[in-house]
């Protein structure tokens, strides 16, 4: 298979428990929190501006392993290490439900584009639930090792799951829970998966000795292309809402490619430790990365320039999600909190 990025169809994409103001942080690579003040109501010490306000969403009893926002921006879904699935009404700041799951080891959480379904990577399975009440409708059984990543097709009819342990990609029919196909030939430990916005392809990333990005036809499941081997583990992938760019977390680098011609747009060194996860804002402005240092870095999607570093979490930051307008970022971490970052000032 040739190393290339297949040409994609281009289109225009259609056009925020307990809340406490925690701190202010500022753009600039050297921004840092005031370490001498243990009080959470602090202001970062820096001369840069404008400010980025952050709120704490606390009350969780387990590490935040995955989170996501419904497409309408009304609800936040949170998966925690104590096997709880929690849905929060963001407008009313109320918990809609918090349910204990019989499965654990939550690794990823996807929400369908119509906002009706949750798919949760848990143990060797994928738990499919209704968003509105948390009712489990299907358990997708077939993987023989921990499921690392999960994604809905844009029409919500197909779920793709990947496991770095069993080195398979599995495609499921959402409505019936039936396994459509298993992809296992010549695969490395695949841990991330994302669909293109037009639904024509899904893209996977691998760790281990493989360290390649693979492109798959979402209808025939044919392998369309494989990238050159990357210099580090591919810990996360995201496609911009306009379908033009692929962004990846490769070790501690943020990389972006033009999907039309495979041209690398930028490769930027981020934190000193590995990046855990990556997210692209729906307004095509920002790339957010979270790392093992407990910090979040925001990059300009146009040129890869670092815009700001967000500090405040204690421990690894494991999950990120943007609001639909791209002005708010949600982060979940080992410290059992979700932080809500107001990025609107960055665009001024």
Swiss-Prot record:
GO cellular component labels: outer membrane-bounded periplasmic space
One protein family per Pfam: WD40
Top-rank lineage group of the source organism: Bacteria
InterPro entries: Apc4-like_WD40_dom (IPR024977), Quinoprotein_ADH-like_sf (IPR011047), WD40/YVTN_repeat-like_dom_sf (IPR015943), WD40_repeat_CS (IPR019775), WD40_rpt (IPR001680)
Protein's UniProt name: Uncharacterized WD repeat-containing protein sll1491
Keyword tags: Repeat, WD repeat
PANTHER family: TRANSCRIPTION INITIATION FACTOR TFIID, TRANSCRIPTION INITIATION FACTOR TFIID SUBUNIT 5
SMART domains named among the record's database cross-references: WD40
CDD domains: WD40
Placement of WD repeats on the sequence: 59-98, 142-182, 185-226, 229-267, 270-309, 312-347
């Amino acid at each position: 298979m040739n190393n290339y990025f297949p040409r994609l169809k281009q289109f225009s994409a259609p056009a925020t428990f307990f809340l406490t103001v925690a701190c202010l942080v500022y753009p600039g690579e050297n921004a840092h929190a005031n370490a001498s003040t243990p009080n959470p109501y602090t202001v970062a010490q820096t001369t840069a501006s404008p400010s980025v306000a952050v709120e704490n969403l606390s009350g969780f009893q387990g590490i935040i392993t995955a989170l996501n926002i419904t497409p309408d921006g009304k609800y936040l879904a949170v998966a925690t290490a104590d096997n709880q699935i929690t849905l929060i009404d963001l407008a009313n700041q109320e918990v809609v439900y918090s349910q204990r799951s019989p499965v654990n080891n939550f690794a990823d959480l996807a929400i369908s584009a119509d906002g009706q379904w949750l798919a949760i990577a848990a143990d060797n399975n994928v738990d499919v639930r209704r968003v509105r009440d948390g009712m489990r409708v299907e358990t997708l059984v077939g993987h023989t090792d921990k499921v690392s990543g999960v994604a809905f097709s844009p029409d919500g009819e197909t779920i793709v799951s990947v496991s770095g342990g069993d080195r398979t990609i599995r495609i499921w029919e959402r409505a019936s829970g039936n396994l459509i196909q298993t992809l296992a030939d010549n695969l490395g430990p695949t841990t991330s998966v994302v669909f293109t916005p037009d639904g024509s392809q899904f893209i996977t990333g691998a760790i281990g000795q493989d360290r390649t990005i693979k492109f798959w036809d979402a209808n025939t499941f044919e392998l369309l292309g494989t990238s050159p081997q990357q210099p580090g583990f591919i810990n996360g992938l995201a496609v911009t809402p306009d379908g033009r760019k692929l962004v990846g977390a490769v070790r501690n680098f943020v990389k972006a490619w033009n999907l039309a011609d495979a041209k690398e747009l930028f490769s930027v060194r981020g934190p000193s430790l590995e990046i855990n996860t990556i997210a692209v804002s729906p307004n095509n402005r920002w790339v957010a990365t979270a790392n093992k240092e407990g910090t979040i870095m925001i990059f300009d999607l146009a040129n890869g320039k670092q815009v700001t570093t967000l500090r405040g979490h204690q421990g690894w930051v494991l999950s990120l999600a943007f609001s639909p307008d791209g002005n708010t970022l949600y982060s979940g971490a080992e410290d059992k909190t979700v932080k809500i970052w107001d990025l609107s000032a960055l665009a001024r």
